[in-house]
Amino acid sequence: VTVKNLEASVHARLQNHARATNRPFQELLQYYAMERFLYRLSKSPHRTRLVLKGALMLHVWDAPLARATKDLDFLGRLDNSLENLERVVREVCAAGVEPDGMAFDPATVRTERIKEDADYEGVRVRFVGLLGKARVAMQIDVGFGDVVTPGAETITYPVLLDFPAPELSGYPRETAVAEKFQAMVYLRTLNSRMKDFHDVWLLASQFTFDGAVLAKAIDAAPIAFTPEFTEKASTLAQWTAFRNKLRN
């Protein structure tokens, strides 16, 4: 199979999948690109240095109603300089793997500090993925310094088509919940990240947890669940807008 034929075949199969599942083609293309980047990461020397977290882990856990995302989130276990992250992502982009129709251009890799929260230490990486002539904007957010309890797990990321599945390091569910509680407590009434509440609800309703592992995260009685926060008009408006966004 030639490269062009493979690209066309993957494109057609993603279109068929989009029709069969009633999902936008562009959304599936984005997920396919992220999946194949993860596969390249899993075949690189950096597979344990970037621990997958965030919304994509909801798909690993096969959580119903998992929200859509366009970004890859990682915990970095490596030097957090912009130059190092740029080098690492370029190496992953250029990794030699079984042909899957995707290409990632190392020359497009750009890095910047994440400034959304002065106390959040992170790096954002942007680059371009290509499926034939179809361009996919890729974004990676890498955080540093978080403790993973009870420890990172080896995960198998689910694939859209029949290409090899990525096997790499990922967050345990307990750490995912604990981090979101931390954001709720830290941001207090300034919290506009409705996705944190959605994800905690989703995980709590679908899975069982070891209470001892979660106890420290919940023990502080987060202000996020007091009337001061939940009854604010701005909070209710944000939650309604977030729910409407999920339905679209």
Question: Which residues are covered by each model-predicted region?
Answer:
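Structured mid-to-C-terminal alpha-helical surface segments
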Residues: 1-51, 60-68, 72, 76-248
